[in-house]
């Protein structure tokens, strides 16, 4: 997957650059994917329903393809999500995933934990420690941990 700068679309980056840098220092722009792949409906229509980790793996795979092997991605997801969120019916055809079942009871358990585990993966062979600095209103820092 290729990522582009929100302030200069001629700037391209790979997933590692996007996640480790967060933003383009020259422009101040954020990196975003150049495309947003659709999740195959056959995954969501399985009976029994796929686990949260299975869905997370299939959602993340196109964004990291060529940079994180499948077995490493599965390990990152297992480490980031050692909990199973609840999906509850809202009505006959709609469901809601409750985002307060992670370790900090905050929605950030779902995004921040994956980001931190991915950054740790890319830093695993480096000689310098990885420090993630977050601005927080209270739940972000603990979700990254």
What are these regions (language model features)?
Residues 1-145:
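PLP-dependent amino-acid enzyme catalytic core
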């Amino acid at each position: 997957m290729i990522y582009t700068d929100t302030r200069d679309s001629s700037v391209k980056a790979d997933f590692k650059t996007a996640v480790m840098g967060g933003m383009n220092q020259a422009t101040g722009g954020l990196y975003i994917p150049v495309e947003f792949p659709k999740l195959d409906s056959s995954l969501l229509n399985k009976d029994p329903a796929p686990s949260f980790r299975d869905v997370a793996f299939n959602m993340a795979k196109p964004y990291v393809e060529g940079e994180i092997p499948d077995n490493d991605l599965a390990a990152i997801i297992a480490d980031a999500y050692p909990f199973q969120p609840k999906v509850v019916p809202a009505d006959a055809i709609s469901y809601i995933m409750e985002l307060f079942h992670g370790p900090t009871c905050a929605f950030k358990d779902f995004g921040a934990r994956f980001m931190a585990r991915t950054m740790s993966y890319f830093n695993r062979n480096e000689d310098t420690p990885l420090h993630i600095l977050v601005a927080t209103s209270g739940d972000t820092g603990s979700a990254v941990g």
